[in-house]
Design a protein with these regions (language model features):
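Short, solvent-exposed amphipathic alpha-helical segments in soluble enzyme
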Residues: 103-106, 130-134, 155-158, 189-191, ...
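Anionic-ligand anchoring segments at beta-strand to alpha-helix junctions in alpha/beta enzyme folds, i.e.
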Residues: 82-136, 268-309, 468-477
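C-terminal amphipathic alpha-helical interaction region
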Residues: 379, 384, 399, 403-405, ...
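Extended, charge-enriched "interface" segments that sit outside catalytic cores
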Residues: 1-77, 324, 332, 346, ...
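Active-site phosphate/pyrophosphate-binding segments
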Residues: 161-316, 327, 361-473, 484
């Protein structure tokens, strides 16, 4: 099953079900119904009609946003004369596409570099305060609602620092937000340099081709015209009059959905090195869109290929192959997986700006996979609980000065273990927890820790030990970032995850100015809220609190599995 840029390898039975789904969509006019924003493409319940039909503004973005390219380029010329660095303050859909664009395209000569801040760990915030010349830094405050707790906490910290320096702080900020949001009002009151208003009918994870993605991209000198024109090719290939069987987006959506129906729901990405960050954006789109009502597709990203034997029957693979990259290792591994009978999609890219096509293709595919699964791919019904529980902890802190922390079940040196265990021995307790895993499950490592290469390396080792020992998919993410990406899947899927949470002491904490809390308090409350939310949803979860040398502790915990 092949097209010029996309090859699908699978059993005859799977390929037949995909073709049958495409024929059904043709018969039911699914393409026209998508463009007519017909909510019955996903749900028959009238109470969901507004939520569904009001979230399809992304369909015409590639053609629509080309009208704003010159305006954005003019603004980029203004910015590059005044600033050496850009720091984007945002979470989830507001931050993932900009991060992918910078890691993929880099910065053009003469343009500022981009840093995405999406960690509330005080060490992550301090790194910017200590290492950046704030007078040469432009801050992008990026939030659809304008009320994202993490984003606004970042804003207060940097606005306060600039105010204390004697500068006119508003000159160092721009906002990207929805019309009528509290952030739009704040930007007016604080006299931000500029505010970009995005269409409200585009959900956060579908917003890569709105100002949320395009403004940061143009400010680093990326060719947003090429990005949009490439995306427009898929838009035209998925329009009302499209022959569905010729649309790569519809075909990929049918493939994702049909595999999920036969319990193949773990999707591992192998990606040429030059575009290695792209699956981080896909991860949120797929996980948050499909992980609900006991269903879901689990993306597995940023891991090296393993032997064929370490993958379960629930696995399938997407291979992004960029022309002229060194793809030798991936080519060999993918051939072995195909020969072993695993479903595989190979997507061929000619250059980096083909990402524009792929962004739009995945939006179409994810929406249509939602149609197969009969879910609403545009809501996130289970996200609010963790926020509510976190806010309750924060309110308790503001009243008493103390967070309602749980008493550890086991303490071993500088490692505290939370949960209920038969054994009081840390090794036995951890192995007792992981032994609950059965075929079709996955592990999710959730690290409310500061970013560092050392910690990344240790978490990667833990992932590989778990994968190779249990032959199950293993995902990982930093908190609170993952709460805005895979958090919905964790609480909304069919209870297939086993969750390993890491937290740490708030060393060298930092107050959020005039808010009555610190970044250390905030990230601790967020970890506590997610722990409670997972438990309230009947999830299997273990939490390690680490003091001192984080890398050494994670390595020790990994050794407990040997």
């Amino acid at each position: 099953m092949q097209s010029k840029g996309q090859e699908i390898f699978a059993s005859d039975h799977i390929l037949l079900t995909v073709e049958s789904r495409l024929q059904l969509w043709k018969k039911n006019n699914a393409c026209k119904r998508l463009w007519n924003m017909d909510p019955t493409l996903w749900k028959q319940k009238s109470e969901e009609d507004v939520e569904l039909s009001n979230r399809l503004g992304w369909l015409n973005l590639p053609s629509l946003m080309q009208d704003y390219v010159n305006e954005l380029k003019d603004f980029a010329e203004e910015v590059k004369k005044a600033f050496d660095n850009i720091v984007l303050l945002g979470m989830g859909g507001s931050s993932l596409a900009p991060e992918v664009f910078f890691k993929t395209f880099g910065k053009k000569t003469g343009y500022p570099a981009l840093k995405v801040l999406d960690s509330t760990h005080p060490l992550s915030v301090r790194k910017i305060l200590d290492n950046y010349n704030l007078s040469k830094t432009l801050f992008i405050v990026s939030s659809k609602s304008g009320g994202t707790t993490e984003t606004m906490s970042f804003f207060y910290a940097f606005y306060n620092s600039l105010s204390m320096s004697g500068a006119n702080p508003g000159d160092y900020f721009i906002a990207i937000t929805d019309k009528g949001s509290s952030l739009e009002m704040l930007a007016q009151n604080k006299k931000f340099r500029k505010t970009f208003i995005t269409p409200g009918e585009v959900g956060g994870r579908y917003s890569a081709l709105t100002y949320f993605g395009l403004v940061p991209a143009v400010l680093i000198g990326a060719d947003i015209d090429a990005l949009l024109k490439n995306a427009e090719q898929i838009e035209k290939n998925s329009s009302k009059n499209t022959v569905i069987s010729s649309s790569e987006g519809f075909r990929l959506g049918a493939f994702l959905g049909e595999l999920n129906l036969i319990k193949k729901d773990k999707i591992t990405f192998f990606v040429s090195s030059s575009i290695s960050s792209f699956p981080s954006w896909i991860e949120q789109l797929v996980a948050e869109s499909t992980g609900k009502e006991g269903k879901g597709i689990v993306p597995v990203i940023l891991e090296p290929p393993g032997d064929v034997e370490v993958y379960g029957n629930d696995s399938f693979f997407i291979y992004y192959r960029l022309k002229n990259d060194d793809n030798t290792q991936f080519d060999s591994n993918i051939e072995k997986l195909i020969n072993a009978g695993f479903p595989v999609v190979i997507i061929h890219l000619d250059d980096l700006y083909d990402l524009g096509k792929e962004i739009y293709k995945w939006e179409i595919a994810t929406a249509m996979a939602g149609s197969v699964l009969e879910i609403n791919p545009f809501d996130q019904p289970n996200v609010q609980l963790a926020k509510t529980l976190s806010n309750e902890s924060m309110e308790e802190y503001k009243k008493t000065g103390i967070l309602p922390l749980e008493k550890p079940a086991i303490i071993y040196e500088n490692i505290s273990l939370l949960g209920k265990f038969i054994s009081s021995d840390i090794k036995k307790a951890f192995n007792e927890f992981v032994s609950q895993a059965v075929e079709g499950n996955y592990f999710a490592i959730q690290s409310f820790l500061p970013y560092s290469e050392d910690i990344d390396s240790s978490i990667d080792k833990l992932k590989m030990v778990l994968r190779n020992k249990f032959h199950l998919a293993v995902t990982s993410g930093y908190g609170p970032r993952f709460l805005h990406s895979t958090g919905q899947l964790h609480k909304g899927d069919g209870n297939k995850g086993l969750f390993i949470q890491f937290t740490s002491d708030a060393v060298n904490d930092l107050d959020v100015p005039d808010r009555g809390y610190s970044f250390g308090t905030l990230i601790t409350a967020q970890a506590l809220g997610d722990l409670k939310a997972l438990r309230n949803n009947g999830r299997r979860v273990i939490s390690f609190h680490l003091s001192g040398k984080l890398k050494d502790h994670i390595d020790y915990i990994t050794s407990l599995l040997n």
